[in-house]
Amino acid sequence: MAAAVVDPQQSVVMRVANLPLVSSTYDLVSSAYVSTKDQYPYLRSVCEMAEKGVKTVTSAAMTSALPIIQKLEPQIAVANTYACKGLDRMEERLPILNQPTSEIVASARGAVTGAKDVVTTTMAGAKDSVASTVSGVVDKTKGAVTGSVERTKSVVNGSINTVLGMVQFMNSGVDNAITKSELLVDQYFPLTQEELEMEAKKVEGFDMVQKPSNYERLESLSTKLCSRAYHQALSRVKEAKQKSQETISQLHSTVHLIEFARKNMHSANQKIQGAQDKLYVSWVEWKRSIGYDDTDESHCVEHIESRTLAIARNLTQQLQTTCQTVLVNAQGLPQNIQDQAKHLGVMAGDIYSVFRNAASFKEVSDGVLTSSKGQLQKMKESLDEVMDYFVNNTPLNWLVGPFYPQSTEVNKASLKVQQSEVKAQ
């Protein structure tokens, strides 16, 4: 079989090598390579050795590959034909392959210069457009910011005025509340003697005093309230002590009169009459002390006895109420004070039980009267001791309300009950 002959002019390798772009590029690279070897002697020797090595390797490879190439020559011819056809199509589509490198570089430079001019013109126009746009935006933003600042300023001023109005309203409300509180304190806690003297000095001197602030008024009101409450509680303790002493003294006198009447019941008529007169005077004085001044009453012995026993019951009831109040307020105090308060309540209950159901002097024995007088003396001493401890050793914040509760009303109610009992007898 005859071998296929390949036209060297149609070899795809030769066609590629003869392309202007490839050949011109090869010339440029070759000239650069030669120039480099000439400029650098050491590099030239290395390059020459490398060239010799490449030639030797290439020669050996061609010698060993030649039999294979000869066997594959038909296939190579077919592949070369198809490659040449593909190269033809590439040359049609890419005219740049038939242009030398110098022309391509010149065209590229022209394109770059034109692009540069276009870009410069575009950038200048864009710069002007951006500058104009930015200027317009700045003007609009400035106008918007100015309007916003004015609106914000107006809103802030309105808010400040509203807050100031609320502060003024609250200040007025606080001032009114403090004024009412001061009036209530003056009403329920009157001025003490020291404060009255200070007020008198202020009036005499005509000192012009600047109106204090609300904080100062609140502090003054708190101090005034504590001070006046303390003095009022102290005066109530002293008043309770005085009333309890008077009650014990009256009860002691009543017991003594009952004892005197019992001992002289069977003596001479003048002694009986004297005892009755004393009892009657005691009855009238006691009624006047609680607000009654009715002297148009019977003066007989039975009425005198019942009235005297009514006095004793009322006085013992008052004393018992006082002792119960003392016992309640003694909670939390030292144990000896609490024990004394409890003992006071027990003794008051014993004395009250003596006169509670007695209808005449005969029902009250001499021994009971003597024992009652001894208990009254002990109660007076113990009550004085407990009251002195309250005044001198404890804060008076435990005193709330009247310490000696509504004695006048209790006396009047008791008197009405006792008068109804006398009328029934």
Swiss-Prot record:
Protein's membrane topology: Peripheral membrane protein
Q: How is it modified after translation?
A: Acylated; primarily with C14, C16 and C18 fatty acids. Phosphorylation at Tyr-230 by isoform 1 of CHKA (CHKalpha2) promotes dissociation from lipid droplets: dissociation is followed by recruitment of autophagosome machinery to lipid droplets and subsequent lipid droplet lipolysis.
Q: What InterPro entries does the annotation carry?
A: Perilipin
Q: Does the keyword Electron transport apply?
A: no
Taxonomy, superkingdom: Eukaryota
Q: Mind listing the GO biological process terms from this record?
A: cellular response to glucose starvation; lipid droplet disassembly; lipid storage; long-chain fatty acid transport
Q: Name one Pfam family in it.
A: Perilipin
- What does the entry say induces or represses the expression of this protein? By dexamethasone.
Q: Where in the cell is it found?
A: Membrane; Lipid droplet
Q: Which residues carry this modification: N-acetylalanine?
A: 2
Q: For the modification Phosphoserine, which residues carry it? A: 213
Q: Phosphotyrosine-modified residues are where?
A: 230
For this UniProt record, give its keywords in alphabetical order, as a comma-separated list. Answer: Acetylation, Lipid droplet, Membrane, Phosphoprotein, Ubl conjugation
Q: Which SUPFAM superfamilies match?
A: Mannose-6-phosphate receptor binding protein 1 (Tip47), C-terminal domain (SSF109775)
Q: What's an example GO cellular component term for this entry?
A: nucleus
Which tissues is it found in, per the record? Adipose tissue specific. Expressed abundantly and preferentially in fat pads.
Family the UniProt entry places it in: Belongs to the perilipin family.
> What binding partners and quaternary form does the record give?
Interacts with IRGC.
Q: PANTHER family this protein is in? A: PERILIPIN, PERILIPIN-2
Function in brief = Structural component of lipid droplets, which is required for the formation and maintenance of lipid storage droplets.
The name this protein goes by in its record: Perilipin-2
Report the source organism.
Mus musculus
Corresponding gene? Plin2
